[in-house]
Amino acid sequence: VRIHPRRGDALSEKVRLEVLTTASRRDGVRLQIERTIEQNRKIFDFKLQELPHIESAITALQNGTGDLVAMSALDWRNLDVEGLSIVGILPRREPTWVLVSNDKPEYLCSKAVVVCDNELLRRQMRRLRSDLIILTSEQFAERIGKLDAYLNLDEEDRIHWIEECRQDKLLEGFVVSRGEHSALRFKSRRHTLGLQREKPERTHFVPPPLHGFTLLVSRTGFPSATVLPMFDPSAYLAHRIEAALLDSLPKEIHSLVGIFVEQRKFKTILKEAQRSNDDFTNDSFLDSNHAQGKVSGKNLTGSAKWERSVPKKGMSTSPRLEIKVETLNYAGTVTASAERVSTLEESHMSMVNVLKEFMNLLETMQLDHEEMVRKFPGLPEEYSLARPPLMDLHSVQASSSEEE
């Protein structure tokens, strides 16, 4: 880190930063760091140096070259980063994935072919539409007799090949991360596979963990206070919680679990609850004695009931941390999920509680149901019979559409 006086102001100091980066890795990092540098040029004197690949950038930083390396959260987990630490995290990009298709997923034709290389997203797509034919890229290439041609392509060219096949009507759509979509040569129509907070009647998609983060990494001991203006504390907290949750789960289910952590305003949560007629959330935060339905003596429900409500006495209106975790069986017919909203001060305990709830739920759903000796009047005899586990995460049972 070098410091220069600003021209015309000998008392001002401008921090010089050498940032190491790579060509686009289809994860959104390169584009975001370029925008961040442009937005902060009045504060910092940047030098952006491109290296051939992320491994060489990390090695250069470890050997004393440069000040910072911009990388994704997944690279941070998967590569050798000994001697380095996270200085800060840029504002999080949208982590949800997209369906590249002419139609929304609900309106795809029956038995439409959709390519997706992420196991979690494949299961979520089956939950939405059990009739869809969900294939990996290799399965699709083999299906149309072009597996060798596909395997001979460079990795960065394969997504373009899939898009060309879609334009040739060999498939109806494919699911990719937003970074991969932005790398397409032609920006085709996309549909967000999101949380659907404003439309709870639609199938939701909790994204794979740790997507959308751009980490700025430096050698341990770097004076992080000098670069604080670039960073987003809420993104740092979300990354810490998501990474801790993922590390606490069994490795064999990492590819099957969706995790999403976000800091949200108190008012935003309430407005959303009123739009979706979520009386549970409203009743948790608001004083029901001041709800319009009781003041006027009318039996109102939904948003009208809470129009004149106020937060409960002693209820903090500070931002909240929302945590969502889910997994599905192969066919997408059974989902195990846990979620919690807490204050930022209670974020660690909230994470611990969500983890306990999720693991207990998962364990219970994977147990065999023994035959019940006691009979319950009014219930069919089948109710007491022994049953297999409600959820089997690992058995691969092809759906009828794929068998055909």
Where are these regions (language model features)?
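Small-molecule-sensing regulatory modules
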Residues: 2-55, 127-404
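Short beta-strand-centered segments that line the small-molecule binding cleft or hinge
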Residues: 56-98
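Local beta-strand N-terminus motif with an aromatic residue
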Residues: 65-66, 111, 171
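Short, hydrophobic beta-strand segments that form beta-sheet elements in well-ordered domains
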Residues: 69, 113-116, 174
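Alpha-helix capping/helix-boundary segments
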Residues: 75-76, 120-122, 180-181
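Flexible hinge/capping segments at coil-to-helix
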Residues: 99-114, 128, 132
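Short helix-loop capping/hinge motifs at secondary-structure junctions, enriched
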Residues: 104-108, 121, 221-227
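Secondary-structure junction motif
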Residues: 117-127
